[in-house]
């Protein structure tokens, strides 16, 4: 037992001595490994953290932007400068089979080397030495990417130093990026010639396909071209491309006959509709104005079938009215709830030499009567009641410069309710309303509604602003018009589905709802438009039209609770329209757009109910006298329903109509005195006014008046309605610049053309005479 213990002790002692002898060696190995590890870490740090500006710039470079519609269908690819196409796709968007083919063709061991392949380098070096020239390369995918990031100079000779530099850059890339990211960058940057870079753009430009639609033959073909785009071109050198493709195909058991190969890889040209360019250009400018880089992919809410319908409608109408010299059309449709643009047609024909490239959605036009709803909205905001009666009679406004508005049909309709004045688009009530509200107040309100084109135009703005004489864009007009179905909220226009923007309440909810009620009232429209079938939709809708600038601008606005539409027709090259054309043309297009969007939903009962415009909450519809706007008395022959603010109901109940009275047993109308001359010209019976007979005199115009042409109305329909009163007999004769304009009996009314310059008027009645002068500017 003791001997065994002694033997074990000796053995342990010997082992201890051996360990002591090995300790210096172990320490040396550890030190060497530490040094090697430190060197490797240092080298890695140098490669990883040393400045690599070319890579930094490369990662930030701009790519072609792909625009998709609301169904994720590609509608346009925006090229870079000088027409270069370079679409960018993430590795997840690139089919695995396509990745595999490129790895087989270029770098089988890509995922297993640090950026360079030692075996390939030795092989290439041996072959090059044997041939005494460079006949073989050893470039990995990472080295090729390094060459793309830092391109060789065009005349630089390829030497061992050139290759060494690319190898070092490849290592720098490998230390900074993952293998998947390197492959992704490589596949998106490969040169294919003809201003095409990246497999995504190559697939589209060679085969008019998305990457996931490529056949195996086409995938292999794309892997062949980048090595030498010209040499392996399937168009110029089909034999070369076929031979190389078969080399790659053999490695994946793919074989095909040459004639089948040529057929399966036939080039198909990609064509995008140029009419999309107006919208695309606007989007790019929006990003540019905000100093933002446009993303590689933009998902729009564009409804492509709707856009095609609009383009067809515009072209058809322009062909029908081609003899009127109307050459351009534009349309815009937005979704009220979101502010998304669902259709933008900037011009009916982008290739039209007559200003086809000009975008009618953002070019400025006179709006005509299409802006009148905003004037009446401001009136409601200021407390003017919906029951207010407007005098649609000859009037002039202003001081030194007298502004004389005319109705489009040169008729005057006497007292009219606010809803009729707006729905029938009467001019004189609108001008009187602006005169009372003030131009500054209205201009400020329009700017608040997003009419930024009006900035800086106040000095040259007069009362004709009520009739839309100032220039604005269709984009501003459609966006602003959407506040009415949107309960007074002005939505920011959304470019894509990701943007989130703030909205603004510009008018009260009830104001917006009342305007919708006015504009959807078909009976109220009848005075100005008759029974216009174009406005009679099967669903709740509102319309407002406008013509201006000698019919050079014809506009229609339309909306449902869900959508707002704007259509413009006219000439962008400044040519004058030679025939009278009505706003019913764009109104018909707008109606067809709303039908497309809304009629399919009418089959759903719950949806049909949701299409109705909401009613104001702080107002109650009450019976009023249709003529006076007051509470009807027992003599009022006609009553209508109109909104009265709840807080004013008691006051309204006490304001009974005083216009309709019984006189000598018969119903008589006691018009206010301002209607005296209008009533006298209507050949009406059963009325009374405070008529005062005086010596012959002009009631209109006044002596020394200055008239200004209204650009919103064609020159040939602008006339001055001359009115006189008094005299000893019921017959008078008018002389205009010394020329007789004929006799008038009972009613002393004449119409003379509005002609520039100084003019004189003289009236003779028995032995009385009166003369005045006026100026037309």
Placement of each model-derived feature along the sequence:
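Soluble, non-transmembrane domains of envelope/secretory-pathway proteins that act on or interact
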Residues: 12, 25-26, 68, 250, ...
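Non-catalytic, structured segments within soluble enzyme domains
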Residues: 37-44, 133-308, 312, 444-447, ...
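Active-site SXXK
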Residues: 102-103, 252, 256, 310, ...
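Short, well-structured active-site flanking segments
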Residues: 111-121, 197-200, 259, 380-399, ...
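Conserved catalytic neighborhood of penicillin-recognizing serine enzymes
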Residues: 130-154, 271-289, 337, 384-442, ...
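Active-site loop and adjoining helix of the penicillin-binding protein/serine DD-peptidase-beta-lactamase fold
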Residues: 174, 226-244, 294-306, 352-392, ...
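A penicillin-recognizing enzyme superfamily signal
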Residues: 300-323, 332-335, 344, 351-363, ...
């Amino acid at each position: 037992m003791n001997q065994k213990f002694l033997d074990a002790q000796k053995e342990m002692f010997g082992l201890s001595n051996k360990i002591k002898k090995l300790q210096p060696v172990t320490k040396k190995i550890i030190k060497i490994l530490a040094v090697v590890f430190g060197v490797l870490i240092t080298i890695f740090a140098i490669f990883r953290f040393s400045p690599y500006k070319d890579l930094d710039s490369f990662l930030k470079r701009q790519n072609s932007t792909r625009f998709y519609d609301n169904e994720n269908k590609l509608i346009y690819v925006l090229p870079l400068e000088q027409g270069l196409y370079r679409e960018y796709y993430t590795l997840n968007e690139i089919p695995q089979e396509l990745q595999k083919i490129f790895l087989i063709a270029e770098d089988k061991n890509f995922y297993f080397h640090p950026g360079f392949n030692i075996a390939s380098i030795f092989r290439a070096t041996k072959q090059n030495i044997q041939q005494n020239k460079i006949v073989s390369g050893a470039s990995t995918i990472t080295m090729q990417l390094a060459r793309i990031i830092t391109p060789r100079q065009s005349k630089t000779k390829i030497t061992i130093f050139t290759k060494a530099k690319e190898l070092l850059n490849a290592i720098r890339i490998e230390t900074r990026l993952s293998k998947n990211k390197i492959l992704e960058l490589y596949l998106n940057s490969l040169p294919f010639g003809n201003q095409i870079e990246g497999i995504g753009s190559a697939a589209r430009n060679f085969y008019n396909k998305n990457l996931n639609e490529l056949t195996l033959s086409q995938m292999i073909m794309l892997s062949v071209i980048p090595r030498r785009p010209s040499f392996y071109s399937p168009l110029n050198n089909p034999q070369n491309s076929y031979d190389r493709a078969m080399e790659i195909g053999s490695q994946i058991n793919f074989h095909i006959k040459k004639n089948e190969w040529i057929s399966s890889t036939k080039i198909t040209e990609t064509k995008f509709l140029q009419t999309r360019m107006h919208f695309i250009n606007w989007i790019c400018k929006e990003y540019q104005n905000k100093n933002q880089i446009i993303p590689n992919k933009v998902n729009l809410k564009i409804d492509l079938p709707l856009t095609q319908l609009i383009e067809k409608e515009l072209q058809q109408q322009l062909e029908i009215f081609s003899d009127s010299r109307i050459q351009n059309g534009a349309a815009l449709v937005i979704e009220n709830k979101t502010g998304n643009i669902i259709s933008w047609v900037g011009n009916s024909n982008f290739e039209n030499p007559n200003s086809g490239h000009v975008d009618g959605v953002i070019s400025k036009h006179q709006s005509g009567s299409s802006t009148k709803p905003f004037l009446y909205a401001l009136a409601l905001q200021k407390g003017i009641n919906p029951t207010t009666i407007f005098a649609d009679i000859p009037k002039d406004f202003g001081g030194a410069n007298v502004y004389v508005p005319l109705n489009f049909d040169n008729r005057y309709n006497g007292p009219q309710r606010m809803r009729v004045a707006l729905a029938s688009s009467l001019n004189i009530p609108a001008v009187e309303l602006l005169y009372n509200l003030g131009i500054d107040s209205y201009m400020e309100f329009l700017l608040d509604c997003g009419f930024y084109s009006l900035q800086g135009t106040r000095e040259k703005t007069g009362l004709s602003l009520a009739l839309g004489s100032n220039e604005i864009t269709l984009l501003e007009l459609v966006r602003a018009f959407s506040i009415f179905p949107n309960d007074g909220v002005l939505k920011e226009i959304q470019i894509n589905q990701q943007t989130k923007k703030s909205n603004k309440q510009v008018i009260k909810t009830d104001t917006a709802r009342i305007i919708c009620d006015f504009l959807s009232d078909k009976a109220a429209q009848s005075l100005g438009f008759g029974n216009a079938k174009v406005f009679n939709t099967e669903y709740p809708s509102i319309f407002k039209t406008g013509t201006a600038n000698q019919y050079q601008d014809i506009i229609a606005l339309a909306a449902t609770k869900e959508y707002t539409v704007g259509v413009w027709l006219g000439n962008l090259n400044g040519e004058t329209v030679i025939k009278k054309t009505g706003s019913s043309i764009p109104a018909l297009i707008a109606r067809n757009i709303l039908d497309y969007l809304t009629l399919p939903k009418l089959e759903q009962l719950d949806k049909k109910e949701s299409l109705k415009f909401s009613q104001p909450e702080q107002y109650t519809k009450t019976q009023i006298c249709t003529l006076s706007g007051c509470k009807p008395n027992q003599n009022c022959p006609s009553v209508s329903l109109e909104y009265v603010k709840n807080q004013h109901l008691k006051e309204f109940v006490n304001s009974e109509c005083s216009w309709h009275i019984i006189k000598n047993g018969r119903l008589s109308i006691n018009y206010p005195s301002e209607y005296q001359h209008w009533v006298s010209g209507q050949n009406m019976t059963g009325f009374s006014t405070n008529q005062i007979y005086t010596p012959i005199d002009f009631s209109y115009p006044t002596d020394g008046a200055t008239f200004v042409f209204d650009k919103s109305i064609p020159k040939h329909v602008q006339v001055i309605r001359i009115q006189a009163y008094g005299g000893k007999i019921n017959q008078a004769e008018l002389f205009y610049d010394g020329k007789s304009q004929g006799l008038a009996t009972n009613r002393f009314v004449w119409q003379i053309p509005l002609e520039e310059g100084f003019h004189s008027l003289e009236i003779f009645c028995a032995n009385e005479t009166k003369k005045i002068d006026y100026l037309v500017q």
